[in-house]
Amino acid sequence: CMPVMVPTMDFSVEGVVHPFVKDAQPNSWQMSRGNICIFTGSNMAGKSTTLKALTLAVWLAHCGLPVPVKSMICPLYEGIYTSINLPDSLRDGRSHFMAEVLRIKEVMQKAVTGKRCLVVLDEMFRRTNAKDAFEASVAVNELLKGFSHCHFLISTHILEYAKAFEKDSSCCFYYMEAEII
């Protein structure tokens, strides 16, 4: 369908699928409150695929193209940034963790400019231990709350991180269910 592009922060999709996934399960989602949405669920529940599908839908919408959804209301973003599957670099002496820290720093520098952005962070700090990942994720989330002109879509396996913000009005949540058949 052709999305409805709006000059506000309203953002919702109905029936989004990733076009490269055969027999994809459609998902409906909306930014129900705040500027941060935390996606939770078990391994292989579809968090990363859903984030990729949403990001692709937003990108296609901004190109003026049809989107693989039933319906979509999308803000007019001035930038789309992702942190998904970042590579390490032996040549540059950069670990996966360092690559992620540098990417988050880069995204924060874009957000500080005041431009309306969509930022997608897939499992922040997944390449470090659970305690450090939790603490770093909470610290980043606290900073992101201050950028109300941006939307942040964040997936996580760290339930304690999600619980730390469950009553925070800047965050909404999307739980991805999985069924073993």
Where do the PLM segments sit?
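ATPase nucleotide-binding head domains, primarily ABC-like/P-loop NTPase cores
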Residues: 3-181
